A protein has these predicted regions:
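Conserved structural position within tetratricopeptide repeats
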Residues: 58, 62, 95-96, 140-147, ...
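N-terminal leader/linker segments that initiate helical-solenoid repeat arrays
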Residues: 20-77, 81
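Terminal, low-structured helical/coil segments at or just beyond the last alpha-helical repeat
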Residues: 189-192, 196-241
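Structural signature of tandem alpha-helical TPR/SEL1-like repeats
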Residues: 46-55, 81-90, 117-143, 167-179, ...
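Residue-level recognition of tetratricopeptide repeat
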Residues: 76, 110, 117, 161-162, ...
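Canonical tetratricopeptide repeat
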Residues: 73, 107, 158, 193, ...
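Helix-start (N-cap) detector for alpha-helical repeat units in TPR-like alpha-solenoids
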Residues: 68, 102-103, 153-154, 188-189, ...
Length: 241
């Protein structure tokens, strides 16, 4: 019985491979019929065949480019609806077509960050692995975006927020936020996150100085009042009050 089962399995595998081979051959014959190319022999026939197949390749390339764009647009639609998981899937697919597009990685970072918030421990196992994995995906996506475009302000800011408020790795946030502020010196929110990072790492003077910068430059009354309150907290910590 064992030999019969093995023989039957081998026959099934052979049939599958033959079927795949037949399918590929059928596709090839269809392509040849569509292009009017069968078995070129002369120089002119080879040139004509190459030209026809190059056009087919160009058409496929154009279609792939459009598919990537549509995935990106669909992802943005899902973001508008706050459907972060669906959006994340779309941006991951878009990256398959545009692997060097920093914006796609940025949005993966954003979506993964939101997905981390919804990754609840529904089985009550006490595990935070799923949440942590989403946060690490967000980190790697932001880092990839910055690797492609090192002056990408939104990715620098997103990474800073992630390190300070989600991963509790404020020391890692500081260089990225400082870089951001050399690019956009008036980025008040980045100053606030950097001040927070300084405070969490024990550099209270630097934290107070950053809050002071916000106080001097912002026109937003609420942000100014918050910076004044936080500056006092930082100075009190610096002088042990």
């Amino acid at each position: 019985m064992k030999k019969i089962r093995i023989t039957a399995s081998l026959l099934l595998l052979i049939l599958i491979f033959v079927s795949c081979g037949s399918s590929n051959a059928a596709v090839k014959r269809l392509q040849q019929t569509e292009e009017g190319v069968s078995s070129p022999t002369t120089i002119d026939e080879y040139k004509e065949a190459i030209a026809k197949y190059e056009k087919r390749v160009a058409d496929i390339t154009l279609a792939n480019e459009q598919i990537g764009i549509w995935y990106k647009i669909l992802g943005s639609r899902y973001i508008d609806l706050k459907m972060w998981g669906e959006a994340l899937s779309c941006y991951q697919k878009a990256i398959e077509y545009y692997p060097e597009n920093q914006n796609l990685y940025y949005y993966v970072g954003v979506c993964a960050g939101y997905m981390a918030h919804s990754a609840l421990d529904y089985d009550a196992t006490g595990s935070t692995t799923k949440k942590y994995n989403y946060l690490k995906l967000s980190e790697s996506a932001y880092l990839r975006a910055i690797a492609i475009e090192n002056r990408y302000v939104r990715a620098l800011y997103g990474l800073g927020v992630l390190y300070v408020f989600e991963l509790d790795e404020s020391e890692k946030a500081i260089p990225y936020l400082k870089t951001l502020l050399t690019i956009d010196t008036g980025h008040t929110d980045a100053k606030s996150v950097l001040a927070n990072a300084y405070f969490r790492t024990g550099d209270f003077q630097a934290s107070a100085a950053m809050y002071d910068s916000i106080i001097k430059t912002t026109k937003d009354k609420e942000k100014k009042a918050l910076a004044e309150a936080n500056k006092k907290i930082a100075l009190d910590a610096a002088y042990g009050r």
